[in-house]
Amino acid sequence: MIKKTIKKIIRALGFDLTRYNHNSSESARISQFFSIYRINTILDVGANTGQYALWLLESGYKGRIISFEPLSKAYNHLIINSKKDPNWIIAPRMAIGNEEGKKTINISGNSVFSSILKMTETHIKGAPDSAYIDSEEIYINKLDNIRETFLKNEDNIFIKIDVQGYELEVLEGAINTLPKIKGIQIELSLVHLYEGQSLYHNMLGYIINLGFELYDILPVFRDKKSRRLLQFDGIFFRSL
């Protein structure tokens, strides 16, 4: 009776109370994958203010994290958050892609949706607060050009890619780095949310051809009205 009453109170506040299950916990599954593959270095591409790295640290991850972020405002917050762990390294402010030079990035009202690519109406309808409100010039480089600065031969590397439609370009600029990488977490879109982006079916084939296998799927972004899934994270690892 007491348990039911507590559940009702919690649900009235907009939350739910469930028994912890390591099989249904995203952080627990990621931690298990990291343990199996002995991951000790994570490339956090598209770090924003460090949300992913903070989540990893809260989940018990103890290895190195190397974060990359192009937006100046988000980068400043990222620097502050990184002081919470001595193994969290912040690269110079830059975007990661398949070229070296300068680009213009569009800044979203919700900065996590900012992108080099133009946003589609589908995205804006799905999340009205995501519309672009500004832009800034940024530096862009390839992982292949900078890997020796950050990576060691003994590293067991996992790369997380959250770049709002620019995922293929990141992989194309890391062709010589990818053979050293054990696993990938990458945001994949079911519909065109950014103009010119590659959709999930093309990305799945591309990543599998690189020698990875799909291990898990994490829902990421839904249309607020229809609840249709628009984006998910694919978790890939090389075969053991």
Walk through the language-model features, giving the residues of each.
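Phosphate/nucleotide-binding beta-alpha loop and adjacent structural elements of enzyme active sites
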Residues: 1-240
